[in-house]
From Swiss-Prot:
Gene Ontology molecular function, alphabetical: ATP binding; ATP hydrolysis activity; proton-transporting ATP synthase activity, rotational mechanism
Record-given protein name: ATP synthase subunit beta
Similarity annotation: Belongs to the ATPase alpha/beta chains family.
Topological relation to the membrane, as annotated: Peripheral membrane protein
GO cellular component: plasma membrane; proton-transporting ATP synthase complex
Oligomeric form and interacting partners: F-type ATPases have 2 components, CF(1) - the catalytic core - and CF(0) - the membrane proton channel. CF(1) has five subunits: alpha(3), beta(3), gamma(1), delta(1), epsilon(1). CF(0) has three main subunits: a(1), b(2) and c(9-12). The alpha and beta chains form an alternating ring which encloses part of the gamma chain. CF(1) is attached to CF(0) by a central stalk formed by the gamma and epsilon chains, while a peripheral stalk is formed by the delta and b chains.
Keywords, comma-separated and alphabetical: ATP synthesis, ATP-binding, Cell inner membrane, Cell membrane, CF(1), Hydrogen ion transport, Ion transport, Membrane, Nucleotide-binding, Translocase, Transport
Catalytic reactions of this protein: ATP + H2O + 4 H(+)(in) = ADP + phosphate + 5 H(+)(out)
Top-tier EC class: translocase
Enzyme Commission number(s) of this protein: 7.1.2.2
Principal localisation: membrane
Pfam family, one: ATP-synt_ab
Protein role: Produces ATP from ADP in the presence of a proton gradient across the membrane. The catalytic sites are hosted primarily by the beta subunits.
Length: 474
């Protein structure tokens, strides 16, 4: 078969125009083209047809050093990456090349990063709770197996730490495979996460096939094309795990889905499309839908997705985070005000919600305790203005009691993390759902009204709080 060869006619930042002449067939949209820049393979993805013989492409690698007249080969297919067991314990880039210095990924199976979502008839509708061991999440905004969870928060409130704790808790307790897509985040954090996984045994360097996680990175320093596609590459690996061996439960982490949108906006501007609200791409909802609709459970296996979503300037009405809302089953909102109080995880118990916090799914007791906790916290929030102006003394006895309980609940929602042990020196805690419900039930019923607030800060179960109170009294 004769190769379809074109030549570069123009390079503007990450956009490359390639001309196909001499009866060459024009490559299809989304086809991967290859060229070699100082022996370095560069992959270009066809984005637009310009005229009869030119295609406009987005580069997946650095265009530095590309020159006009350089030969480009049409592969005839979209980007394909290795999938399956061979990817475990490895880090690859958007086009499936290893970036961990451990040699080629020897997989017998490769797969296109573009796939349709599963048919309706094959999708599963069952709902089971995924216990994370994190009190505030399990009680107030529980996650579902096969659900989509959004972690919302501004810069520096703890999204990545929470994701690392979820990988630690859920991957170990759950036993399935995990895929982590690093989309446009800090390279240092990606490196830290990799070494953290090696230290905790999630990645086994001696026998990579025994590892529990595959990593796909397209970090901040990569061109927008790579950042716009790396989430699809990660999802393709997650789908391969879900569908293998008659089905698996897979965890799919994306850090950060906002960077996926941001890269899409950059690509859109480079291609000359007219921007929509706040400068985002006109195809924002379509791009997000194509990714999110593939993250789903079938009758054989599930993909549970946790997506960190950076909120620009803490504005939840920004088109990027608000477009994500429509696809999520649960939202965990991280609050700067709570982080400023020193309460970690800084999850906002009133803003965070979940579709499965329903008595038919979680049970009557869990639902009742969660709603009582929220009611106490909401009352405290509404009283804060009065306290700020008039002070605590002006409150009724009933309101004083509510404030006291709310402050204890607020502190009891904090928890030491395993992945933060190295920073805090405090042993991490995994709290079972029954212990979480029992602890908060006792708090709202007033069983622990006599204990000091400090006893509830950074503990696991309620028994630990009681023990801490005894130590504080000494």
């Amino acid at each position: 078969m004769t190769q379809n060869i074109g030549k570069i006619t123009q390079v503007i930042s990450a956009v490359v125009d390639v001309k196909f002449t001499n009866n060459s067939k024009l490559p299809e949209i989304l086809n991967a083209l290859e060229c070699y820049n100082a022996k370095q393979r560069i992959v270009l993805e066809v984005a637009q047809h310009i005229g009869d013989d030119t295609v406009r492409c987005i580069s997946m690698g650095s265009t530095e050093g590309l020159i006009r007249g350089l030969e480009v080969i049409d592969t005839g297919n979209p980007i394909h990456i290795p999938v399956g067991i061979a990817t475990l314990g490895r880090i690859m880039n958007v086009v499936g090349e290893p970036i961990d210095g451990k040699g080629e990924i020897k997989s017998s199976t490769i797969s296109s990063i573009y796939k349709p979502a599963p048919d309706f008839i094959n999708q599963s509708t069952e709902r089971d709770i995924l216990v994370t061991g994190i009190k505030v999440v399990d009680l107030l905004a529980p996650y579902t197996k096969g659900g989509k969870i959004g972690l919302f928060g501004g810069a520096g409130v703890g999204k990545t730490v929470l994701i690392m704790e979820l990988i630690n808790n859920v991957a170990k307790a759950h036993g399935g495979y995990t895929v982590f897509a690093g989309v446009g985040e800090r390279t240092r954090e990606g490196n830290d996460l990799y070494h953290e996984m090696i230290a905790s045994g999630v990645i086994n360097l001696e026998a990579p096939e025994k590892s529990k996680v595959a990593l796909v990175y397209g970090q901040m320093n990569e061109p927008p094309g790579a950042r716009a596609r790396v989430a699809l590459s990660g999802l393709t690996i997650a789908e391969s795990f879900r569908d293998m061996n008659a089905g698996q439960d897979v965890l799919f982490f994306v850090d950060n889905i906002f960077r996926f949108t941001q890269a899409g906006a950059e690509v859109s501007a480079l291609l000359g499309r007219i921007p929509s609200a706040v400068g985002y791409q006109p195809t924002l909802a379509t791009d997000m839908g194509e990714l999110q609709e593939r993250i789903t459970s079938t009758k054989h296996g599930s993909i549970t997705s946790v997506q960190a979503i950076y909120v620009p300037a803490d504005d939840l009405t920004d088109p990027a985070p608000s477009t994500s809302f429509a696809h999520l089953d649960a939202t965990t909102v991280l609050s700067r005000q709570i982080a400023e109080l020193g309460i970690y995880p800084a999850v906002d118990p009133l803003d965070s919600n979940s579709q499965v916090l329903d008595p038919m799914i979680v049970g009557e007791e869990h639902y009742s305790v969660a709603r009582q906790v929220q009611q106490v916290l909401q009352t405290y929030k509404s009283l804060q203005d009065i306290i700020a102006i008039l002070g605590m003394d002006e409150l009724s006895e009933e309101d004083k009691l509510t404030v006291s309980r709310a402050r204890k609940i607020q502190r009891f929602l904090s928890q030491p993390f395993h992945v933060a042990e190295v920073f805090t020196g405090v042993e991490g805690k995994f709290v079972n759902l029954d212990d979480t419900i029992a602890g908060f039930k006792g708090l709202v019923e007033g069983k622990y009204d006599d204990l000091p607030e400090a006893a509830f800060y950074m503990v696991g179960t309620i028994d630990e709080a009681v023990e801490k109170a005894k130590i504080l009294k000494i």
